[in-house]
Amino acid sequence: MEYQELLHQRQSCRAYDPDRPVEQEKILRCLEAVRLSPSACNSQPYHLTACTGKLARQVAPLVQGEAHNDFASQVPCFVVISEAPYNPSAAMHARVTGRDYRSMDIGIAAAHLTLAAADQGLGSCLLGWFDEEKLRALLGLEGEVRLVMALGYACPGDPLREKVRPPLSQLADLIEES
């Protein structure tokens, strides 16, 4: 798939086919895309935990609540992104600049994961609503959970929605030096 087409095809999926598991090789390709993504000082300060089968069914209620993410019970795979330590160089840069590179790196990683999923015909949805304490206990994670991604095949007939975004002129400037 061409990159621009991929950008238009990727959307947050909230209707998954619960009877169609995600093949392990597709999950691994998504994780590999994250491994290859850029990060501050090449630190990759995160850990990915892919959950399928019974474990995915245990994760589902931990990302639901207060009328959020009702679709989670249909999701065949969740990827939990938690923090990992910086490498020494990135840690020093973060201290000196006061910038949270880890958050930036996790955002970059998540973007790569969603695009890799779309490239393989998978739907995805980034979830910021979750019970962190219970997720960490269930998965034995030491680092703070930052994002959970739903991953799976969209239900047949789930429409591709038109993207509603501000015009580029509101988001960007192109400054030319003469």
Regions found by a protein language model. Name each.
Residues 43-46, 119-122, 146:
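Short secondary-structure junction motifs
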Residues 34-35, 79, 94-138:
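Small-aliphatic-rich amphipathic alpha-helix that forms the alpha element of a beta-alpha
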Residues 1-77, 84, 177-178:
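N-terminal amphipathic, basic helical "cap/leader" segment at the start of enzyme domains
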Residues 3-21, 147-178:
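C-terminal helix-cap and adjacent tail motif
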